[in-house]
């Protein structure tokens, strides 16, 4: 079990080289300029982290594990160094709460092994931006809320044939649910509107590889991979790798590879 808490007011003085203040004479003529000395007062943070790991080894080639992480963060976002406003006139704050839980199983034998894991991830982000409207009352300008829930599973296997061949395969599945809302959008008619989105998507990934190492100086491998996002499939993605030892003195090696690549837009690209 591990528990970590950290916090800081994050207040410090500094010379702001992104601003220039004018020096005036009695006739209000600029006779000089200088970089002001300021104090950062809006970058405080409070972070709490908790980690719990539990493992059980049967001593017969099987191991079971439980891992859980929790994060709670409350952070102020400081003003820009080019902002000439007063830091007491606004509040810019982001809060995060994340939980990750994983169950795992590892199975080991003389010439093969396999593993499986499944988990759940929950993340909630809250962002608030408030500003003094001039009457001493902090008025909400932005009130953004987002939630991400992900369920996933993964399985891997390795099989050895002698010392020359190694075959591997792995498959993974993710189900994402994303919800984002901004509750402080003012329409032209003066009424408040709630805008955002609620999306879900399944992502699958599978790969298989074969590695051949005829001796201790050279090795070659071929990998085939394919992925699915939503209702679309990527083309088959092949790759070939080769590496060899040119000289054992100094461990000089040569490596070469060729592959095809394909990148699909993630939910982060599309919506976050």
Residue ranges of predicted features:
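Transmembrane beta-barrel wall of Gram-negative outer-membrane proteins
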Residues: 1-7, 19-74, 97-109, 162, ...
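Sequence/structural signature of outer-membrane beta-barrel proteins
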Residues: 8-10, 73-77, 123-130, 176-183, ...
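Flexible, surface-exposed loop regions and adjacent strand-edge segments
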Residues: 8-9, 16-24, 71-72, 79-89, ...
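Repeated loop/turn-to-beta-strand initiation elements of outer-membrane beta-barrel proteins
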Residues: 61-64, 111-114, 163-167, 216-220, ...
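Short acidic-glycine motifs
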Residues: 7, 73, 80, 85-92, ...
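Transmembrane beta-barrel strands of outer-membrane/channel proteins
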Residues: 1-7, 66-72, 116-122, 169-175, ...
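Surface-exposed extracellular loop regions of Gram-negative outer-membrane beta-barrel proteins
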Residues: 74, 124-126, 230-232, 236, ...
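Outer-membrane beta-barrel transmembrane domain signature of Gram-negative proteins
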Residues: 93-100, 107-108, 118-122, 126-128, ...
């Amino acid at each position: 079990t591990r528990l970590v808490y950290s916090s800081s007011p994050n207040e410090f003085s500094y010379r702001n080289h992104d601003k220039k203040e004018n020096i005036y004479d009695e006739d209000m003529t600029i006779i000089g300029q200088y970089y002001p000395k300021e104090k950062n007062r809006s970058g405080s943070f409070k972070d709490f982290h908790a980690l719990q790991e539990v493992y059980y080894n049967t001593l017969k080639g099987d191991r079971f594990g439980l891992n859980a992480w929790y994060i709670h963060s409350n952070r102020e976002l400081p003003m820009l160094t080019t902002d000439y406003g007063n830091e007491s006139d606004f509040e810019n704050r982001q809060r995060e709460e994340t939980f990750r839980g994983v169950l795992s199983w590892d199975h080991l034998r003389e010439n093969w092994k396999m593993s499986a894991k499944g988990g759940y991830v929950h993340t909630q982000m809250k962002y608030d931006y408030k500003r003094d409207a001039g009457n001493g009352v902090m008025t909400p300008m932005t009130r953004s809320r987002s939630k991400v829930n992900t369920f996933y599973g993964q399985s891997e296997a390795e099989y050895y044939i002698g010392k020359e061949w190694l075959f591997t395969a792995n498959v993974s599945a993710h189900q994402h649910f994303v919800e984002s809302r901004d509750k402080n959008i003012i329409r032209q008619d003066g009424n408040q509107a709630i805008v955002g989105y609620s999306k879900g998507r399944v992502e699958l990934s599978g790969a298989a590889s074969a590695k051949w190492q005829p001796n201790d100086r050279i090795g070659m491998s071929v990998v085939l991979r394919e992925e699915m996002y939503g209702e679309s499939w990527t083309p088959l993605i092949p790759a070939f790798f080769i590496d060899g030892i040119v000289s054992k003195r100094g461990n000089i090696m040569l490596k070469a590879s060729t592959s095809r690549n394909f990148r699909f837009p993630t939910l982060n690209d599309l919506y976050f």
